Regions:
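C-terminal segment of N-terminal export signals and the immediately downstream linker at the start
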Residues: 1, 22-36, 40-45, 53
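N-terminal export signals
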Residues: 5-26
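Conserved alpha/beta-hydrolase
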Residues: 56-90
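Conserved acidic catalytic loop of the alpha/beta-hydrolase fold
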Residues: 106-122
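Conserved hydrolase catalytic core segment
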Residues: 127-160
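Flexible "cap/lid" loop of the alpha/beta hydrolase fold
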Residues: 152-190
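Conserved loop-alpha-helix segment in the C-terminal half of the alpha/beta-hydrolase fold
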Residues: 258-288
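Catalytic active-site module of serine/aspartate enzymes centered on a nucleophile-bearing elbow/loop
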Residues: 285-311
Length: 311
């Protein structure tokens, strides 16, 4: 590359960096609301990448975290990389994430909320997708002063006297969720929920798509599949939460995906009903969106607009 062309490219890069800086400044100088995004099983903070810019452009701050064992914190079972896959070995290979518990997850959410406060946020709303509803609940149960709102997106959550896993045993959930057949190992044996994100089996990939993302573009879903990791700790679903008094005052919203084949709609309704019974002074607002489980990929703009309305 000659010097003149290099300078043109450098100038273009500087302009892009300046534009990015303007977006960041807008996010900080506008609304004092920050959304702390918490992903679900097998995902990472990257999964909010189509939602965050919309909220940033509207003037809101966002913090998307990687939970322990996920995203850049992921650890892979040794048998996962061997192809062709030894299915029997993969099904019994203990998960390197088996020792991660809900305290680890909740601590990561608290750190995310503290980062938002340190950046100037006067209002912090934690958004948990799917499994992510569990750690945002535990984080707010222990540190309610950090959170002004909790948003459950197609999520599971504990309530007093009932762990999140209890909702997986509901008749409609157990009968109609499509996710169970996609698990390739017994969670009790390996200590995790395991899927094969590198599978080339068309039937298996079709099963995952039906369960998680029936309405997501195939090209985008292929990219998502390359970013997913195979394991998610299972112990968190059996842990009971202890709720501080301040939790009852936190505004709660449940966004239910009406085409969800993973956390079926009736399960979301049951969680909301139990929350309202536990904390009648601050009822949980139930909002429906026509989407599969992976709403952040299927309907990112609609989801972002719903969240902006809660700021």
């Amino acid at each position: 590359m000659d010097r003149r062309r290099f300078l043109k490219v450098a100038a273009a890069g500087s302009a892009m960096a300046a534009a990015s800086g303007m977006v960041a400044a807008k996010a900080q100088a506008g609304s004092k609301t920050a959304f702390v995004f918490v992903h679900g099983s097998w995902h990472g903070g990257w999964c909010w990448g189509q939602v965050e810019p919309i909220l940033n452009d509207a003037g809101h701050m966002t913090v998307a975290i990687d939970l322990p064992g996920h995203g850049l914190n992921a650890r892979l079972p040794g048998t996962f990389g061997a192809r062709p896959l030894d299915a029997a070995a993969f099904a019994t290979d203990p998960s390197p994430l088996a020792g991660i518990g809900i305290a680890d997850y909740a601590a990561a959410v608290v750190v995310g909320a503290e980062r938002a406060r340190a950046a100037g946020a006067e209002k912090v709303i934690a958004v948990g997708h799917s499994m992510g509803g569990v750690p945002i609940t535990f984080a707010a149960a222990g540190s309610p002063q950090l959170f002004d709102g909790l948003v459950y997106v197609a999520a599971l959550a504990p309530v007093p006297g009932k762990p999140a896993g209890a909702y997986l045993q509901l008749e409609d959930q157990a009968k109609n969720s499509k996710l169970g057949p996609a698990l390739v190992a017994d969670p009790a044996v390996i200590g995790a929920l395991r899927i094969d994100t590198r599978s080339t089996d068309p039937k298996y990939l079709a099963l995952l798509k039906e369960a998680l993302a029936a309405d997501v573009d195939d090209g985008l879903l292929a990219t998502v599949m390359h970013l997913l990791t195979p394991d998610a700790p299972v112990s968190i679903y059996g842990e009971a939460a202890e709720f501080s008094d301040g939790f009852a005052d936190i505004k709660r919203t449940y966004i239910r995906c009406t085409q969800d084949q993973t956390v079926v709609p009736s399960t979301g309704a049951a969680i909301v009903a139990d929350m309202n019974a536990a904390w009648p002074s601050q009822e949980t607002n139930l909002i429906d969106i026509e989407s599969s489980h992976e709403v952040m990929f299927a309907k990112p703009a609609e989801l972002a607009n719903m969240l902006a309305g809660l700021a």
